Design a protein with these regions (language model features):
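Buried hydrophobic residues that stabilize the cores of well-folded domains
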Residues: 1-209
């Protein structure tokens, strides 16, 4: 799978201008958020595995500031792009942003995190490529390849249409394995535990959250 992502990264890098144009053409409506963490995640529980809550969409367009994020959706309510405002360059008098592109193929979705650039410029590189494999519209596996050669694989297991465990293999470059269990006390609440040998460590929600 690493080789597959490397090949896709090379191919999509050459198509960045075309892919950015397709986002503009496909966009049917947009949403906003202004939290440090995004309000959308392709990989299930990606934010929560870090111990944090997922951001929330706003009802109205906010004033542009650091951490503001703009999401682009097509006519089928699929996300096709995301733009994050990183910081304002006082010398150039314009914002530096990071763009994300979403590409849909049969039984899978790609997320491309592009290199940061001024908002009036087009990025030229892909800093991270993520691929999620779908089965019956559910994410069953995800793969990440970073510019620093970090590579990860996550496997999601379901029960009653809910994710109940996640197994992660991370190469940095040595292999690190992690196992997480997810409990659902009720329909609106979930708890994530990291399994460490015979013990369980609660990682979400944090006790002070």
């Amino acid at each position: 799978m690493r080789e597959f992502l490397e090949k896709c990264k090379e191919e999509y890098t050459l198509k960045i201008p075309q892919l950015l144009k397709e986002v503009r053409l496909k966009t049917h409506y947009t949403k906003w958020s202004k939290t440090v963490l995004p309000a959308y995640q392709l990989e299930p529980f990606d934010t929560e595995l870090l111990g944090y809550k997922l951001g929330r969409f706003l009802k109205n367009e906010p004033q542009i500031n650091k951490h503001v994020k703009h999401y682009f959706f097509d006519s089928e309510d699929k996300i096709v792009g995301r733009l994050e405002y990183d910081f304002y360059n006082n010398y150039e008098k314009e914002w530096v942003v990071t763009r994300f592109l979403y590409i849909y193929i049969q039984d899978g979705i790609f997320e491309l995190k592009l290199s940061s650039s001024h908002i009036t410029e087009e990025p030229t590189k892909i800093n991270r490529i993520t691929y999620v494999r779908l089965f019956n519209d559910k994410v069953i596996e995800s793969y990440n390849l970073h510019n620093d050669n970090r590579f990860s694989k996550l496997v999601y297991k379901y029960s009653d249409n809910k994710i109940v465990s996640i197994e992660r293999d991370l190469w940095i470059p040595n292999l690190l394995k992690s196992i997480y269990e997810i409990e659902y006390p009720d329909e609106n609440t979930y708890i994530i535990w990291e399994i460490d040998n015979d013990s369980r460590v609660k990682i979400y929600p944090k006790e002070d959250s």
